[in-house]
A protein has these predicted regions:
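N-terminal secretory signal peptides that target proteins for export/translocation
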Residues: 1-8
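Bacterial N-terminal signal peptides
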Residues: 11-24
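N-terminal "domain-start" segment that seeds a small globular fold
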Residues: 29-54, 126-128
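Short active-site neighborhood of thiol/selenol oxidoreductases, capturing the structured segment around
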Residues: 57-77
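Short, solvent-exposed cationic patches
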Residues: 71-82, 178-187
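Structural microenvironment flanking redox-active thiols in thiol-disulfide oxidoreductases
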Residues: 73-121
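Short, internal strand/loop/helix patches
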Residues: 95-97, 110-148
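Thiol-/selenol-based redox modules, centered on thioredoxin-like
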Residues: 149-187
């Protein structure tokens, strides 16, 4: 009888350990947002001086962000604008998002914004450009990007979840993936 009770209590203890382990794994396992990345919340403004709260204040629940880190990546972002016909296709909400090292002062940020305005003289371009002043490495890590060597086209929602991401210049297959993700989900 003593052996049976010891065995039964061992089985109960083992069962409890298994249940607790399963629960811990379910809670700790990565969900889609953790796997793809998450855009941190921040306040910014377009080059037209319109304030924007990102991601909560995005114009659509699914927005295409063309993220660049270096001036020479502008052509990669431009290839997406041309390839997806973003300047004419109002069905896609989008923005340019250059990620810039924060100079640390309001005057330094103003100087960078003034240089950007020289590079983007058109009001339509300025309205779509939202500079992000932050630590680039932290941004790359949070959003789940591979580094700063290429630009990225990223679909984000208003909660900041990265729903899709592609790297580099426009490509028809990559564009198909982004278009599918940009489509609203019906139930």
């Amino acid at each position: 009888m003593k052996f049976i009770l010891k065995s039964m209590s061992s089985y109960v203890a083992l069962w409890l350990v298994a249940v607790v382990t399963a629960f811990a794994l379910a809670v700790a396992s990565p969900n889609e947002a953790r796997v793809m990345g998450h855009l941190p919340t921040f306040m910014s403004q377009t080059l037209m001086r319109e304030p924007v709260t990102v991601p909560g204040g995005l114009p659509s629940d699914r927005t295409l962000a063309l993220i660049t880190f270096q001036r020479d990546q502008r052509a990669q972002a431009d290839s997406w604008i041309t390839g997806l016909n973003l300047n004419s296709d109002a069905s896609i909400s989008w923005m340019r998002m250059p990620v810039l090292s924060d100079p640390g002062t309001a005057g330094g940020r103003d100087a960078v914004e003034n240089r950007l305005m020289q590079n983007y003289p058109d009001a339509g371009q300025r309205a779509k450009l939202v500079p992000v002043f932050t630590d680039r490495a932290d941004f790359v890590r949070a959003v789940g990007l591979g580094g700063v060597q290429n630009s990225y086209a990223v679909v984000i929602n208003r909660q900041g979840d990265v729903l899709a991401r592609v790297e580099g210049k426009f490509d028809a297959d990559k564009a198909r993936l982004l278009r599918e993700t940009l489509q609203p989900r019906g139930f």
